[in-house]
Curated annotation (Swiss-Prot):
<comment type="pathway">
    <text>Lipid metabolism; malonyl-CoA biosynthesis; malonyl-CoA from acetyl-CoA: step 1/1.</text>
</comment>
<dbReference type="InterPro" id="IPR041010">
    <property type="entry name" value="Znf-ACC"/>
</dbReference>
<dbReference type="Pfam" id="PF17848">
    <property type="entry name" value="Zn_ribbon_ACC"/>
</dbReference>
<keyword id="KW-0808">Transferase</keyword>
<dbReference type="InterPro" id="IPR034733">
    <property type="entry name" value="AcCoA_carboxyl_beta"/>
</dbReference>
<dbReference type="InterPro" id="IPR011762">
    <property type="entry name" value="COA_CT_N"/>
</dbReference>
<feature type="binding site">
    <location>
        <position position="27"/>
    </location>
    <ligand>
        <name>Zn(2+)</name>
    </ligand>
</feature>
<dbReference type="InterPro" id="IPR000438">
    <property type="entry name" value="Acetyl_CoA_COase_Trfase_b_su"/>
</dbReference>
<keyword id="KW-0443">Lipid metabolism</keyword>
<keyword id="KW-0275">Fatty acid biosynthesis</keyword>
<dbReference type="GO" id="GO:0005524">
    <property type="term" value="F:ATP binding"/>
</dbReference>
<feature type="domain" description="CoA carboxyltransferase N-terminal">
    <location>
        <begin position="23"/>
        <end position="279"/>
    </location>
</feature>
<dbReference type="GO" id="GO:0009317">
    <property type="term" value="C:acetyl-CoA carboxylase complex"/>
</dbReference>
<keyword id="KW-0276">Fatty acid metabolism</keyword>
<protein>
    <recommendedName>
        <fullName>Acetyl-coenzyme A carboxylase carboxyl transferase subunit beta</fullName>
        <ecNumber>2.1.3.15</ecNumber>
    </recommendedName>
</protein>
<feature type="zinc finger region" description="C4-type">
    <location>
        <begin position="27"/>
        <end position="49"/>
    </location>
</feature>
<keyword id="KW-0547">Nucleotide-binding</keyword>
Length: 279
């Protein structure tokens, strides 16, 4: 039995309102809560610690091209199933399900436009599509991006974001390493710059082929870059790895990279570079 009777009602809770989806983001590195506008204003990086989130090719296009104006090309290409590959599901079913779930058509997108008033061709990979893995379509798109650069007499920027070759296509996937590397020689013959931007992650057959062949090799901060992952290497050699091993800053110290560039400075750095090269 209660001894006291509440005379006045307590504070009445207001109607619960649903928070718009995607209004807040949590930093994967430091745990800070980031408001959507703040997140976008900082080019999808953490305002507290500078962590770079993975972003889609379209967001890179918006950052790089003047007034967000560009022309996408070769988006009609789709993966075939040359091996009839099956693991937990058939390869065509996996591709179809990924397209349905993500709304993306492949792990690479090509576009051309102007950056700083100068023509530029960009081929950007997407980790959100089967880990950004390189199969026949990705290799063909990068090769066609080279052809577009030759056609427009414009420099080429390739943005890598991939776990490596696409195992479901076997040797057809590995062939893309040689194919892309060979096609890039045409840019050298025409004296057109090829800039390779490595983002997190750039691994496996990507790092072992076109990603490391740039006239200028640059990276976003703390990007994981290598062939086998650090855990695999550690378990194989049974030794601890150096601090920061396979991270962008470590590779810069070892001479594998020319610059590590924050995403907010990417466009200005590229515009300055291309103006110095007069292309």
């Amino acid at each position: 039995m209660a001894w006291f009777k509440r005379v006045k009602p307590s504070i009445r809770p207001t109607d619960k309102r649903d928070m718009p989806e995607g209004l807040w983001w949590k930093c994967e590195e430091c745990g800070a809560m980031l408001h959507k506008k703040q997140f976008e204003d900082h080019f999808f990086t953490c305002a507290e610690c500078g962590h770079h989130f993975r972003i889609s090719p379209y967001k890179y296009f918006s950052i790089l091209f003047d007034d967000d104006k560009y022309v996408e090309f070769d988006d009609h290409l789709r993966s075939a199933d040359p091996l009839g590959f099956v693991d937990t599901k058939k390869y065509p079913d996996r591709v179809h399900d990924t397209i349905e779930k993500s709304g993306k058509t492949e792990a690479c997108r090509n576009a051309h436009g102007e950056s700083g008033g100068r023509p530029l061709v960009v081929s950007a990979m997407d980790f959100g599509f089967i880990g950004g893995s390189m199969g026949s379509v990705v290799g063909e798109k990068i090769a066609r991006a080279v052809d577009k650069s030759l056609e427009l007499d414009a420099p080429l920027l390739v943005i890598s974001q991939s776990g490596g070759a696409r195992m479901m296509e076997g040797a057809f996937s590995l062939m893309q390493m040689a194919k892309t590397a060979a096609r890039l020689t045409r840019l050298s013959e025409r004296k057109l710059p090829f800039v390779s931007l490595m983002t997190d992650p750039t691994m496996g057959g990507i790092s072992a082929s076109f990603a490391m062949l740039g006239d200028i090799n640059i990276s976003e901060p703390k990007a994981l870059i290598g062939f086998a992952g650090p855990r695999v290497i550690r378990d194989t050699i049974k030794r601890d790895l150096p601090e920061g091993f396979q991270r962008a800053e470590f590779l810069l110290e070892q001479g594998f990279l020319d610059r590590v560039i924050h995403r907010r400075d990417l466009k200005n750095e590229l515009v300055t570079l291309f103006s110095m090269l007069k292309v």
